[in-house]
């Protein structure tokens, strides 16, 4: 598989300008400094419910996620990234605050992502690099679900105890992980 040429940040639901919300804009600026590498952080359609039927086509036709793309998905964006990788080849998934169920939440249920079983083997077959960031003190996601994602996808897991739902304004570890994918092994 060819080396990645871009990263795409797929945000969590909730709205707000992706360029200025949390760490999204900070990471985009950091990755844009890499010569020959592009990072997209666009506002998603249907930002509150984040419906699968709207987000996955947008990821394909507007964000052009393909085998040279690193998809960085946060929260609902991580869920969209996993569903996307069930049917599309991508270079890598970086999942931040990923989970496996609708958590009993009506809005999550309405998104459509949780209406069927996960196709873990297809995700792994379509994506050779899967990295996950999770925190045991996430106020929205039980650790059990985050750990299940890591186990099912054989993800390289960066486990924290103090990051909550990763809503900070900087994310140095994520930048390092992307850079490590772009550096040929010596």
Curated annotation (Swiss-Prot):
InterPro entries attached to this UniProt entry: AB_hydrolase_fold, Hydrolase_RBBP9/YdeN, RBBP9
Domain of life: Eukaryota
SS bond list: none
SUPFAM superfamilies xref list: alpha/beta-Hydrolases
Pfam families: Ser_hydrolase (PF06821)
GO BP: positive regulation of gene expression; regulation of cell population proliferation; response to nematode; type II pneumocyte differentiation
EC number: 3.1.-.-
Main EC class the enzyme belongs to: hydrolase
Reaction(s) catalysed (UniProt annotation): valacyclovir + H2O = acyclovir + L-valine + H(+)
Keyword Cell inner membrane appears in the UniProt entry: no
UniProt-annotated catalytic positions: 75, 138, 165
Tissue spec: Highly expressed in the spleen, testis and kidney. Also found in the heart, liver, lung and brain.
Keywords of the record: Hydrolase
Region (Involved in binding to RB1): 63-67
Family classification: Belongs to the RBBP9 family.
Physiological role: Serine hydrolase. Catalyzes the hydrolytic activation of amino acid ester of the antiviral prodrug valacyclovir to its corresponding active drug, acyclovir. May negatively regulate basal or autocrine TGF-beta signaling by suppressing SMAD2-SMAD3 phosphorylation. May play a role in the transformation process due to its capacity to confer resistance to the growth-inhibitory effects of TGF-beta through interaction with RB1 and the subsequent displacement of E2F1.
Complexes and interactors: Interacts with RB1; the interaction disrupts RB1 binding to E2F1. Interacts with RBL1 and RBL2.
Descriptive protein name: Serine hydrolase RBBP9
Organism of origin: Rattus norvegicus
Taxonomic lineage of the native organism: Eukaryota, Metazoa, Chordata, Craniata, Vertebrata
């Amino acid at each position: 598989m060819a080396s990645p040429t871009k990263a795409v940040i797929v945000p969590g639901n909730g709205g707000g300008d992706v360029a200025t919300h949390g760490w999204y804009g900070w990471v985009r600026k950091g990755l844009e400094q890499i010569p020959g590498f592009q990072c997209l952080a666009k506002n998603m359609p249907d930002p509150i419910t984040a419906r699968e039927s709207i987000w996955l086509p947008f990821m394909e036709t507007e964000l052009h996620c393909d085998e040279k793309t690193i998809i960085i998905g946060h929260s609902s964006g991580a869920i969209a990234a996993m569903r996307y990788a069930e049917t599309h080849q991508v270079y890598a998934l970086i999942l931040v605050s990923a989970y496996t169920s609708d958590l009993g939440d009506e809005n999550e249920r309405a998104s459509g992502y949780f209406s069927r079983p996960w196709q873990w083997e297809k995700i792994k077959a379509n994506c050779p690099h899967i990295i996950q960031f999770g925190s045991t003190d996430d106020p929205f996601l039980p650790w059990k679900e985050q750990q299940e994602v890591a186990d099912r996808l054989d993800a390289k897991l960066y486990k924290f105890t103090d990051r909550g739902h990763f809503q900070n304004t900087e994310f140095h570890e994520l930048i390092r992980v992307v850079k490590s994918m772009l550096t040929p092994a010596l």
